[in-house]
Amino acid sequence: PPLAPLLPTEKGASLLIDCGANVDARPSHLVQFAKMGSIYMENVMGIRNPRVAIVNIGAEEEKGNALVKETFPLLKECKDINFIGSIEARDIPSGYADVIVCEAFAGNIILKLYEGVGATLISMVKKGMLSTLRSKIGALLVKPALKETLKRFDTSQYGGAPMLGLKGLVVKTHGSSKSTEVCN
């Protein structure tokens, strides 16, 4: 069963599947992840015909490691999903795909980078907004919109990641999660 957190994007959120449960996944596993992710985004998030992409080092079909090269044609042939091809890490925040498929090693790196960039961005913006009198005045004007935008990158807003493919509900959280995160 894969862990499938939602990542904030410019268009809303994308489901990253898998981010920590299956480091040594096989092509058949990634196809199953794509199907589960597509079903989740359609039935839970209300996205009709979700766009599914596989994490790769380039957009071209022939690029990637053995796992990606073996999985790509299987996803392409799969009639149950709306497979749009490869996605590079830099395109994830744009919301290019609704479901982002990968094995857990790559997925965990993507997730941790997202968390780190989010925390750093929040910290940098706060420091910048409080650095001069002029920026403090400007901060008062943009505070509501900025606060709402930055909140999407605050990991405490996301309680955890659902583990899909099980008969019951399982949500994995960080061991350091506080009550706010568990409630979300």
Regions found by a protein language model. Name each.
Residues S14-R26:
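Low-complexity, intrinsically disordered basic tails/loops
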Residues G20, N82, K172:
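Short, flexible active-site loop motifs that bind/organize anionic cofactors or intermediates
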Residues P1-L16, Y96-I100, A104-C183:
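Glycine-rich phosphate/nucleotide-binding loop
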Residues A21-V23, N56-E61, I87-D91, E103-G107, ...:
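Glycine-rich beta-alpha junction loops
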Residues V23-A89, D98:
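Glycine-rich phosphate/diphosphate-binding loop of Rossmann-like nucleotide-binding domains
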Residues P2-P8, A21, I39-G46, E88-D91, ...:
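A generic local secondary-structure boundary/capping motif
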